[in-house]
Amino acid sequence: MSLPRRFIFSALACAVLFAASVLSAKASSFTIDTNPPNASISTFGNPNTATYGQVITAVAGTTTLDSFSFKIQTTGSITYRAYVMAWNGTQAVGPILFESANQVATGIGFQQYTYNTVGVGLSPGTQYVLFASISNTYLPGNSAGTMAARSDNPYAGGSFVYMNNGPSFSLLTSTPWSSFSGYDLAITANFSDNVPGALVAPVPEPATMLLLSTGLAGVVAKVKRRKRNSHRT
């Protein structure tokens, strides 16, 4: 009866591996959230300020940036892109770590715009700038935007920064940016310990675990029936 025994061991091994994958799928997470806003900063767009950003500091253990968001309102529409770059204390440092497709902000009243990065790996303790810019979408009338902010410095790991760089994106990495003392943008930035750019296996529901245990019980019962039948013959 060596074959059934090996079959049982294989089933148990699969169960152990499955349990291990379930545990590993429970990723750690961390969020920077400076909401709700108590102030606003304007004016974002052409021919006004082309780039608004927020400096953040990556935290050890959760260094994959999965998504971030800004709150924008406008009386017209603004076409822009969202970016992530390293920060050296005064300006952005290449290469570009994340660049969104063209985004369009519309409507009076602050709307939250979220950018999913598919996982950007950051270095713990290092500063980065999350920013929105119209420099690569510098269209006439692409203006009248206001960004939600906080005026009470709620986030110690960075601050609000901006640049009047017009259509010249290269100035962002060659010229010091400006800032408002004590201000942060109203942002939400979500981090995890997932592998950058990788899909994380979903954590199974209790029903899935029940099916697994039921299946293993069925395997054991089937082997026992085979043993009884072999004794009868």
Model-inferred region functions:
Residues 220-233:
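C-terminal membrane-anchoring or membrane-association module
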Residues 95-107:
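Solvent-exposed serine/threonine-rich low-complexity stretches and specific carbohydrate-binding patches
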Residues 111-119:
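Exposed aromatic-hydrophobic patches
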Residues 108-110, 125:
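Solvent-exposed, conformationally flexible loop/turn segments
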Residues 4-6:
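Twin-arginine (Tat) signal peptide motif
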Residues 9-10, 14-30, 191-214:
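Short, threonine-centered small-residue motifs that mark membrane-proximal processing/anchoring sites
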Residues 26-91, 120-122, 126, 133-200:
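Beta-sheet-rich sandwich/jelly-roll-like modules and their strand-loop junctions
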